[in-house]
Amino acid sequence: MNRPLQFVLLFFSCSLMQAQNVSPWKRVVAARNLASTRWNENGDPKKGLFFELDKSMVNSTLNSLQGANKTNEVVIEIPNTNGDLEKYEIHEFSNFDSDLQAQFPTIRAYIGKSLSDKSATLYCSFSPKGIQTMVLRSDKPTEFIEKISVNQEVYELFDSNSVKSDRLPLYCATIDKVMNSSLNKMTTTATSNGEQYKTLRLAVACTAEYTAYFGGTFQALEAINATLTRVNGIFNRDLSLHLNLISNSTSLLYTNPEADPFSPAITGVNGNWNLELQRDLTAKIGNANYDIGHLFGASGGGGNAGCIGCVCQDPISSYDVAKGGGFSSPADGKPEGDTFDIDFVAHEIGHQLGANHTFSHEIEGTGVNVEPGSGSTIMGYAGVTDFNIQSHSDDYFAYVSIDQIRTNLASKTCPLNTTIPNTKHKANAGEDFVIPKSTPFVLKGSSSNPNGAGLSYCWEQNDTATTSFGANSIAFPTKVDGPLFRSFPSTNSPNRFLPEQSKVVANSLTSPWESLTDIARTLHFTLTVRNNGLNGLAQTDTDDTTITVDASTGPFEITSQNTSDLSWKSLSIQTITWSVNNTDQLPGSAYVNIKLSVDGGLSFPIFLKTNTLNDGKELIVVPNGISGKNCRILIEPTANIFYAINKEAFAIGYTTESSCTTYPFATPIIIPETAEYSTKTITVLANSDAVLDVNVDLNFTHRYVSDVQIELVNPQGKTVKLFENGCGDTNGSLVLKYDDLGGAIICGKQTAQTVAPFEPLYQFNELNPSGTWTLRVRDAIAGDTGIINSAAITICSKSFTPIPLSPIDLTDVMIYPNPTQGDFVVLFSSQLDSGVTIIVHDLLGKKIVEKAFSSAPLFNEVIHLDALQAGVYFITVVDGSKTTVKKIIKY
């Protein structure tokens, strides 16, 4: 992970203010009076640009969206994480009932669409406290703007990759259960959220501790509005749903700990709050006056929905918890920000709406344990288990959660339904395929787009775990059930490579969260397409595909070009070989295409051969005029979805030389029990090489291993997490060699083991190694101690020397190789357009082979003589009116 990406709100303007030259933002010195900020209290001071905000100027702009003379929208500019100002057309996005909004006109929320990125949607809350924003976009992390000073208008822009991993995660006490039988029997043949936008009446209560944290009733309502802006942003995009805070909400915002109806947090989060909230809402609000109720606490570290899918359901007695029994309360005493809003509030309300847990580290028998380990979507348990994909949830619902919530709400009568006027898009997951074992593949989807929306695409495996839990919940090649592939946030591409193509390039076909299978399995995948629409217009659509893994075929893999320091010359003849392993018998796999990448496997735009037999061998001519230091080969069937990439990068037009050097860090290193990292560094002398591979040796001891976080930072500031809160309550030592090709950690093993890091080390590849490398370690939770006994980093790099170009006369026909074992290439420059004919005769003049080809400026075709006996043959090449005869020897 990169160090926090820190930009400052440089400018915020509106079309109504273009005549003014004064910006509402003023540059201030970073260190000025920031000691009182909550951020600094967290022990993580900011670095970067800081600005003070003229709230009155911004307020006058946004006020144009309200009042008797209100406009439908205005255009504002805010910075994105590239540091560029991005324009958004914004509209009102109130989280309040109309009466409550009239009562608090200065607490507002807005929604906006980017004018330059159709997938980007802005959600913005504004009040006397200041502005807070969230931008959801595909292919990039979510972006936030937050106030970071209590007494000053100082703001920062960051993204979700910058969220601090020491924020304590959610512990959800909601007991998962299958929805009631009437809902189970409902069919879900519809694959979208339909054409109805739903609105629910939300009652939010808060403890006196929550109100005191923000400074009073009004300030608590500001904070609730900020949280709901983020939560409603997710619900709008994924569920076509909006929660409106009821008009008499202030009666539920308690200020006196002695008078509020809730137990202290230490007992409340253990279950007392569910019934206490339900009773309070029944008494103060009345069951007929809200659809869903939730309590915000300020400490205790827990969440509990009370029941699953019981939105709209009234309690049947004073001891019954129904629609008004959910609560969220953080462990770190900070009931605000992305962790609280998404990991806590969106998760627990997701339960109330009808979604079960999606993790598979435990199997709850609900049919939706479809994420490996902890899971990473909203209804997972990111950062909580011994098998964490990541520290916190990504801000979207998995397909199974969307489906559960949609099915549940379809059975309810309390939502206010509004017809979505736009024609919905239609997802297409493509055909079903049969693929070989242990072979990468790519899912290819598409979607109609009748409204020209900024569509985003999310492929997810949809196989629930039935027996694979605990240590077996991770992905591994012989896993018999459950997920092999984690969920990733939506992208602009309708295709997904499995595993990630960067992992395939790094030869990492098996990792804890993405693994190919070595056994026969039937895998189910769902494509969810989001239109990222504004309030009342957002829709999703899904489609499924089935991938059958045939264990009698495969693996399909390239066996050539797999040695270090390999280089090619332009126009040279090269042999490419691959293991067929019966894959030619699979549907659509009798023929293959062979492609070339010159950018390390990011793309394969160059076809070396098309529609050639899947027979395991092909001679090719290296294209003229192409050079590259990081080239790879890809072979794919012409009508199937599996593929192979050769295992080593090679050069075209360069000779290469690789070397490896090990650099030890000074040890021992005391692991600090603070939010601050302890660091040690090594220095790599200046050179022009590129990183080929990085491995790390690490030996550390700790009384509670899961408290430990260890990272490696390269000279460019790129951060890779090596160890991140793993191995639970293990007490002792771990001796680890981190290699991307390593396996999962065996937590109780105290002898050396080669393991894959928490994040892949290949992220350092191709970067220059020169400069300072930093090892960072900390224990953010007090109570246990530890030490790094030894640590070293091995950096392998590669140098390149250009190959002098030698002129080649292609006016004459060249035949390579000669002698040959059977296959040879005919190469020449054809200036005609009348076709090329190649004829093979034996010594007696008998015609053996005759083939016709289309002309090409650089003609190169492979002729197969495998079936012929050893001997001398004559090759006749007819290019229009020109005829050339060559002799070739087969041995």
Regions found by a protein language model. Give the residues of each.
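Acidic, Ser/Thr
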Residues: 444-451, 462, 579-584, 828-831
